[in-house]
């Protein structure tokens, strides 16, 4: 056993890698979690798999993990609920805390918060999934112009998203998104280039990694192209001049800090073709860590390999609240 392995075991103790879960993004989470687990174990970390869809919070507490790496995506893992449970249990965890996770999981709230901090985002409105009429849909299409992006505000991995290019397609696109949630986000389509910017750290120490540009066939960066296809082209670092690169990276850090993110996240943008203006799309607080994922790709360009990236993220694990005296007493009684 090397000194490095010994040091990591002593530093991190028993580590749980949480992946799988109950959201629509379970399949992606399984891929992310298996990659993270293997990476940590290859570094000598005492890491163990834990699937919250198959095991209870009581079992999580019984494992007595010293910290956990959250590799869950979507509801029940990326939306603040799990983070709250881990706070109650006093287990340090990776990624943003309760509030930042909850805000970032909600595309509507993310847009509102970031707009208030000067980060531009496409024009939008929110429609009720049950009461919106066909006439209202047509009215929105006429007001905003086509094409439009319709989204389920709390889903990710391109799940619950429809691009509507004709007035006749509004109802089908709306129905696709409405089956996931109580409201549907309608967003003005931005024609241009799709970018993503990983951000690592916290507060003043938050730093943006190299920008990744995503070029999917016919611009169709859907679930299949995102995780399984080899047809999508990724350019990292994205081919922009230094001034524009720094501008987008600064916007990414501003958005990250605006919602209160810590540890790591990924900030997605569209750059409008007509005037090269960037627009925030969303913030992912538990980004994918699969073989096709963008954070590892960007980190590699910056000089950090997959295993070392996992270690850096794990090292940032924390709880936001200090354990109460009651929790400290319970710990002493164990």
Curated annotation (Swiss-Prot):
Positions annotated to bind ATP: 141-196
Tell me the first and last residues of the signal peptide.
none
Q: EC?
A: 6.3.2.4
Query: What Pfam families does the record point to?
Result: Dala_Dala_lig_C (PF07478), Dala_Dala_lig_N (PF01820)
Reaction(s) this enzyme catalyzes, per UniProt: 2 D-alanine + ATP = D-alanyl-D-alanine + ADP + phosphate + H(+)
Question: PROSITE patterns, alphabetically?
Answer: ATP_GRASP, DALA_DALA_LIGASE_1, DALA_DALA_LIGASE_2
The residues that hold Mg(2+) 2 are 282, 284
Cellular component per GO, a single term: cytoplasm
Cofactor note text: Binds 2 magnesium or manganese ions per subunit.
List GO molecular-function terms, semicolon-separated: ATP binding; D-alanine-D-alanine ligase activity; metal ion binding
Q: Which residues form the ATP-grasp domain?
A: 111-315
- Alphabetic keyword roster: ATP-binding, Cell shape, Cell wall biogenesis/degradation, Cytoplasm, Ligase, Magnesium, Manganese, Metal-binding, Nucleotide-binding, Peptidoglycan synthesis
Pathway given for this chain reads: Cell wall biogenesis; peptidoglycan biosynthesis
Describe the function of this protein.
Cell wall formation.
User: Entry's PANTHER family?
Assistant: D-ALANINE--D-ALANINE LIGASE (PTHR23132), D-ALANINE--D-ALANINE LIGASE B (PTHR23132:SF23)
List the protein's name. D-alanine--D-alanine ligase
State the organism of origin.
Herminiimonas arsenicoxydans
Q: Lineage from the top down? A: Bacteria, Pseudomonadati, Pseudomonadota, Betaproteobacteria, Burkholderiales
Gene name, per UniProt, is ddl
């Amino acid at each position: 056993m090397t000194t490095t392995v010994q040091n990591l075991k002593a530093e991190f103790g028993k580590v749980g890698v949480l992946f799988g879960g109950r959201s629509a993004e379970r399949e992606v989470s399984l891929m992310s979690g298996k990659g993270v687990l293997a990476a940590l174990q290859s570094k000598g970390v005492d890491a163990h798999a834990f699937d919250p869809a198959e095991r209870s919070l009581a079992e999580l507490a019984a494992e007595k993990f010293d910290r956990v790496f959250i590799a869950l995506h979507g509801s029940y893992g990326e939306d603040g609920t799990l983070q709250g449970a881990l706070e109650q249990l006093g287990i340090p965890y990776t990624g943003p805390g309760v509030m930042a996770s909850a805000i970032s999981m909600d595309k509507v709230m993310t847009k509102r918060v970031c707009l208030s901090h000067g980060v531009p985002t496409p024009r939008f409105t929110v429609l009720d999934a049950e009461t919106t009429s066909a006439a209202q849909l047509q009215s929105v299409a006429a007001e905003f112009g086509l094409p439009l992006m319709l989204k389920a505000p709390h889903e990710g991995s391109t799940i619950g998203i429809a691009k509507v290019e004709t007035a006749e397609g509004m109802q089908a696109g709306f129905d696709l998104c409405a089956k996931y949630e109580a409201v549907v986000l309608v967003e003005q389509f931005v024609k241009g280039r799709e970018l993503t910017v990983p951000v690592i750290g916290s507060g003043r120490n938050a730093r943006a990694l190299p920008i990744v540009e995503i070029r999917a066939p016919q611009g169709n960066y859907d679930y299949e192209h995102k995780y399984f296809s080899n047809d999508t082209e990724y350019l990292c670092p994205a081919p922009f001049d230094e001034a524009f690169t720094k501008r987008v990276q600064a916007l990414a850090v501003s958005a990250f800090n605006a919602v209160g993110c810590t540890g790591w996240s990924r900030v997605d943008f569209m750059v409008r073709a007509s005037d090269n203006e960037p627009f925030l799309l969303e913030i992912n607080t538990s980004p994918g860590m699969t073989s096709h994922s963008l954070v590892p790709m960007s980190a590699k360009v910056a000089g950090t390999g997959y295993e070392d990236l996992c270690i850096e993220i794990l090292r940032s694990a924390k709880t936001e609240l200090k354990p109460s005296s009651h929790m400290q007493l319970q710990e002493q009684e164990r």
